[in-house]
Amino acid sequence: MIEVLLVTICFTVFPYQGSPIILESGNVNDYEVVYPQKVPALPKGGVQNPQPETKYEDTMQYEFHVNGEPVVLHLERNKGLFSEDYTETHYAPDGREITTSPPVQDHCYYHGYIQNEADSSAAISACDGLKGHFKHRGETYFIEPLKLSNSESHAIYKDEHVEKEDEIPKICGVTQTTSESDETIEKISQLTNTPEQDRYLQVKKYIELYVVVDNRMYRNYNSNRDAINERVYEMVNTLNVMYRPLNFFIALIGLEIWSNQDEINIEPEVAVTLRSFGEWRNTTLLPRKRNDNAQLLTGIDFNGATVGLAYVGTLCRPTQSVAVIQDHSKRTSMVASTMAHELGHNLGINHDSASCNCNAGPCIMSATISNQPLSEFSSCSVQEHQRYLLRVRPQCILNKPLRKDIVTPPVCGNYFVERGEECDCGSPQDCQSACCNATTCKLQHEAQCDSGECCEQCKFKKAGAECRAAKDDCDLPESCTGQSAKCPTDSFQRNGHPCQNNQGYCYNGKCLIMTNQCIALKGPGVNVSPDECFTLKQNDPECGFCRIENGTKIPCAEKDKMCGKLLCQEGNATCICFPTTDDPDYGMVEPGTKCGDGKVCINRQCVDVQTAY
């Protein structure tokens, strides 16, 4: 049974309007002073079970007033904030690398919401008082302790009451984005996904994030590693809240501080720094620490108003699943917003066009980074992101960490099967399972299972019972083994298997057809160009190359002309190609695509399908 500790906080509220006060987040002109007082309580019908001794509760509630109105803030510890193999790395004065695995299980970073408000969220650090933000009635409020001696006072304020550190608008360094026209966005919104595509989009996705802090930023915080750690934890906790609407969960797998010297050349020219960091990730970081994405936080002032840069549509790639972000604000929420923006580029999202908007406040993917933090994704961003996922299907985001890999003490009754548990159907009052003992989280006598595609009436289904049907020509059906409640791992047809009436060949579980690639890039009503276009554009410097080497575009050989730039036909425009971007694969024919009878594209060459794999 889950132990829930509800902590009621009585806040005495003193609206304050006078001279500004200096908080960690900057100068605040208007705020309310509150004094939290903890009152332990149990939920209605709750039973308190012995639990491992921890400093911070898994679940807490705070009651207080906002503008004279009582609210209840519900908080739950962000159990997915750290991965089990989370490490911290710094460097000794002699350059030695020092890597540790600190005990981060009992951390103090929470997500939450205001009770009885559907559109509410919160990200709070409870390490030393309450610090963070919550959304109430469409507006974002910040809370942080007032550093007064012998006082538990906190300040609650809104973003508009914080003095701006710099009036110059900040920008992202990504310039070669392909913003869609209003007409194209409207057409995309009318597309209907297949049931299989909808299932794929609804599956929870995970990014194991590695954060690097450069030497300048380290020195900016008085060479205090603890202060750096706390700042990064808050940022990643906030990043998680911003990505939940996209069904993404971000786990911090490593934090590295270049405490002795920078391990790469960090230049004011942001593109140079991004390239160097990507090469470092590929050659130095990945061989010693797995991760899905790495971000560099730097204390350098990039040229102009730029505060970040990332490659577009490159998640999971060794050299390009990276971003660089200037630590441009005292406020962690501001820098977290920039981290979210650059990660959005890695996830295939370009800058919003003028027709894109958000329900409240600025959009995360606006080309100009707002002075207001804690933005949200526009409908344009959501559509573009989904198109990227369906077109590329990056594999690293699907490897869900095992429950034992999520750092948290097991809690019986929270519906998650954690280490040492055989099942978890909630509290005894809520449990609806005949197979699971809600008090012990163990299976009932003679029960083999509680849930799963291959579990039926507490028993494993017989071997051979189909548990996952083939979704298309390139998929294979899966059957139960008779020994497990889980359906076996999804498998697919061999590469080169003909699909969709011989229009294409299977490649890594997908039937790759050029017309479908055109639709993914341009929307409905588009087809692949006729063969004559590929001949006509063969020597075109923008549309006729097969690869780029040291910045030089290499034309396709005659036999390989169907494996370079993708050409599409829309209306009277018959030979459309796509502009070159920071993503070298954008607008190129995908590997495994049919380029002739019995031929497929591999490494930008049109080769015999019988020998390609």
Curated annotation (Swiss-Prot):
Amino acids binding Ca(2+) 1: E208, D292, C396, N399
Domain of life: Eukaryota
Class of enzymatic activity (EC top level): hydrolase
Cofactor entry: Zn(2+)
PROSITE patterns for the chain: ADAM_MEPRO, DISINTEGRIN_1, DISINTEGRIN_2, ZINC_PROTEASE
Molecular-function GO terms, alphabetical: metal ion binding; metalloendopeptidase activity; toxin activity
SMART domains from the UniProt entry: ACR, DISIN
Pfam families reported for this sequence: ADAM_CR (PF08516), Disintegrin (PF00200), Pep_M12B_propep (PF01562), Reprolysin (PF01421)
Function: Snake venom zinc metalloproteinase that may impair hemostasis in the prey.
Identification of the protein by name: Zinc metalloproteinase-disintegrin-like MTP8
